[in-house]
A protein has these predicted regions:
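Intrinsically disordered, low-complexity Pro/Gly-rich regions
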Residues: 19-20, 24-42, 272-290
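Alpha-helix initiation/capping motif
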Residues: 6, 11, 15, 39-42, ...
Length: 290
């Protein structure tokens, strides 16, 4: 009887240990996709960011390149139209010169009129709005890629929280401009620590001030990683420029993906891991006999 009680007690202890172990397994389950309410240890690596971004770019190359090309055409159209209207509305005065050798030449002086000044001002506003729209659109698509959601070309033209993005962008430009007037360095520092503000506005619908605060906290949590990520993004864009600007169709999407990866990792969020090729099926072939 005592032996039976002993085995029953031993079985009870084993069941309790297994139940506790199962509980530990549940506790160790990874959190659902998204992001926590506070920053965690990110385990960020710029090498992983570059590898992940390139992997995701190769899987969505056309979907990423076409929107960048379309935005580039739109930017060129706004710049060209503004410049053409400014020149057309300005006053031009032609002066002829003849040197001592009898060679004649002309110079054209262009004086901007009030109408031309208004057109230039409106052109700057349109260009600024288009850049923010492009930034928000590309971030929206890249964030969906980071979440593992299917994306299309149209995804990059449907930015989320556009109103918050516009106000956040205006806030960043205003503070950076004021910092630049006081001294160049404060403006540059603020621009650097506020680099994730638009991503917060797009991804988490935070207010402009909260987006800037969250970006400063995120950069402060890993300054070294933020600097390396920024340098990697800059390198991707510069390499694209060196390739006769055609490479920017690749460099800009890769830089945007690095930016999103860094933002998610440093802010305690998650990204869908890169898909690696599966190993070959079956045993490898053995040595061939002659």
């Amino acid at each position: 009887m005592y032996k039976s009680l002993f085995f029953q007690a031993e079985d009870g202890i084993r069941d309790a240990q297994e139940s506790r172990g199962l509980g530990d397994v549940y506790k160790r389950q990874p959190p659902p996709p998204g992001y926590p309410t506070h920053l965690q240890s990110s385990g960020f690596s710029v090498g992983d960011a570059i590898s992940w971004s390139w992997n995701r770019f190769t899987q969505n190359a056309v979907t990423l390149v076409v929107p960048v090309l379309a935005y580039a055409v739109a930017l060129a159209a706004v710049i060209g139209a503004t410049a053409g209207l400014v020149v057309a509305l300005s006053d031009r005065a032609t002066t002829a010169y003849t040197n001592t050798s009898g060679v004649s030449s002309e110079s054209v002086d262009i004086t901007m009129t009030p109408a031309a000044g208004i057109v230039m001002f409106l052109g700057y506003i349109a260009l600024f709005a288009l850049v923010l729209y492009m930034h928000a659109g590309i971030l929206t698509g890249c964030l969906d890629i980071a979440d593992g959601k299917p994306v299309t070309i149209a995804t990059f033209f449907r930015p989320r929280n556009l109103g918050l993005v516009l106000v956040t962008g205006l806030l960043i430009v205003a503070v950076t401009f004021i910092g630049g007037l006081l001294c160049v360095i404060p403006g540059l520092i603020f621009g650097f620590v506020a680099q994730f503000a638009v991503a917060f506005a797009v991804d988490r619908s935070t207010s402009p001030i909260d987006s800037v605060k969250a970006s400063i906290e995120t950069v402060g949590s890993n300054i070294g990683g933020s600097v390396l990520s920024w340098l990697a993004q800059l390198t991707a864009v510069l390499v694209g420029e060196l390739l006769c600007f055609v490479g920017m169709l690749i460099g800009i999407p890769v830089a945007a993906l690095i930016h999103v990866y860094t933002y998610r990792k440093l802010s305690g969020g998650q990204v869908v891991e890169a898909v690696r090729p599966a190993p070959p099926v079956g045993w490898p072939p053995g040595p061939q006999l002659a």
